[in-house]
Amino acid sequence: KFVQRKYYGYEIDDSKPVVISTWQSLATFDKKYFEKFDCVVGDEAHLYKSKELQKIMNACINAKYRIGTTGTLDDSKVHKLVLEGLFGRVHNVTTTRELIDKKQLADLKIQCLILKYSQDECKHVKKLNYQEEMDYIVSHEKRNKFIRNLTKTRTGNTLVLFQYVEKHGKVLYDLIGDTLDHQTRKLFFVYGGTETKDRETIRSITENENNAIIVASYGTFSTGINIRNLHNVIFASPTKSKIRILQSLG
């Protein structure tokens, strides 16, 4: 009656006063469209440092009430100032430790696995730039087979996160799938091209499973996704982003 959804798969109905939308769906709208809003609520507010989201927020010139929610801010002063300019002063309402103690977040255990490479490989990689080194790491056959074996030997539902779809995500999915007993264990692949409804279906199925594997991109399964029945997360691709790591763990 009062709420409309404005993203892929839903028809536009401007007769309803409350709009729930992705920023991608709103990015094509004219500035005038946003003048009618009195209130803006931005979930995953740490993402609002992007130019497109700032453009949308700045177009909401009549929005007196602005609320941004996030569990992760990075350590950059500039990042914090940008968000305060859009939403107002930051208020910390709780901590990760408090949420873990209240059983609202998982009491996680972090295991850092260090893979050792040959001297010749180290000498070769030393000459590469950042992107070339990343490409070398994610295409390393032994490393990918190690991730496959690690994934298959975990007990419970396991999420494997990757950064590059073609050169890493699909490779891992095929490696795991080729040697998996599909009768006893479900395997899913999720990336930017996966429909929103299909992602939700996969999430729902996993919550009712106890030994499923999801191979997913950081972009689709590191922010805004909540799987209550998840036992293991494997970071298959290297990342320096504090927010990405914390969001994935959350």
Please provide the spans of the model-predicted regions.
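Structural recognition of the conserved hydrophobic beta-strand(s) that form the central parallel beta-sheet
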Residues: 19-22, 64-71, 213-216
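Conserved Walker A/P-loop ATP-binding site and its immediately adjacent core
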Residues: 1, 53, 75, 164-169
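Conserved helicase ATPase core of P-loop NTP-dependent helicases/translocases
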Residues: 2-15, 159, 168-171, 184-222
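A short beta-strand element within the Helicase C-terminal
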Residues: 35-41, 215-216, 223-238, 247
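Conserved SF2 helicase motif VI
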Residues: 57, 73-74, 240-250
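Conserved helix/coil segment N-terminal to the catalytic DExD/H
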Residues: 8-39, 50-55, 220
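Post-DEXD/H (motif II) to motif III coupling segment of the RecA-like Helicase ATP-binding lobe
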Residues: 38-39, 44-111
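Conserved interdomain hinge at the start of the Helicase C-terminal
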Residues: 124-163, 167-181
